[in-house]
Amino acid sequence: MISDKIKLTAKDILEKEFKTGMRGYQQEEVDKFLDMIIKDYEAFHKEFEQLKQQNARLKRELEEQKLVATQVPQQPVVQTPVAQPVYNNTNTDILKRLSNLEKAVFGSKLYE
């Protein structure tokens, strides 16, 4: 796990004492830099904890969804024959209209 690999905490960084030599560092500059590191470290830790919680929540939701999916019986989808009568009625209407149109256009020539 990642928390096993992390060696420092924000507190460790804050409390770290550095030795100074003859031509040592500027203490204020190092302190400001360490303060920035601490803030970033705390933000990363907070984000990490939120992501762990979100990950755990999503895993629970996934397991719940899997459980629900296995409990719902799979029923075959049955199509109702509603479309067929409509199709037959449409054909009948078209044939009647065609017959009426032929009578109107050709008149009595068809029946002679």
From Swiss-Prot:
GO cellular component: cytoplasm
Cross-referenced Gene3D superfamilies: 6.10.250.660
Cleavable signal peptide: none
InterPro entries for this protein: Cell_cycle_GpsB, DivIVA_domain, DivIVA_fam
Pfam family, one: DivIVA
Record's keyword annotation contains Lipoprotein: no
This protein's UniProt keywords: Cell cycle, Cell division, Cell shape, Coiled coil, Cytoplasm
Subcellular location per the Swiss-Prot or TrEMBL entry: Cytoplasm
Transmembrane segments: none
Broad class of the protein's primary localization: cytoplasm
GO BP terms: cell division; regulation of cell shape
Coiled-coil parts of chain: 38-72
Family from the record: Belongs to the GpsB family.
Free-text function comment from the UniProt entry: Divisome component that associates with the complex late in its assembly, after the Z-ring is formed, and is dependent on DivIC and PBP2B for its recruitment to the divisome. Together with EzrA, is a key component of the system that regulates PBP1 localization during cell cycle progression. Its main role could be the removal of PBP1 from the cell pole after pole maturation is completed. Also contributes to the recruitment of PBP1 to the division complex. Not essential for septum formation.
PANTHER family linked to this entry: CELL CYCLE PROTEIN GPSB, CELL DIVISION PROTEIN DIVIVA
Known partners and oligomeric status: Forms polymers through the coiled coil domains. Interacts with PBP1, MreC and EzrA.
Protein name: Cell cycle protein GpsB
Record lineage: Bacteria, Bacillati, Bacillota, Bacilli, Bacillales
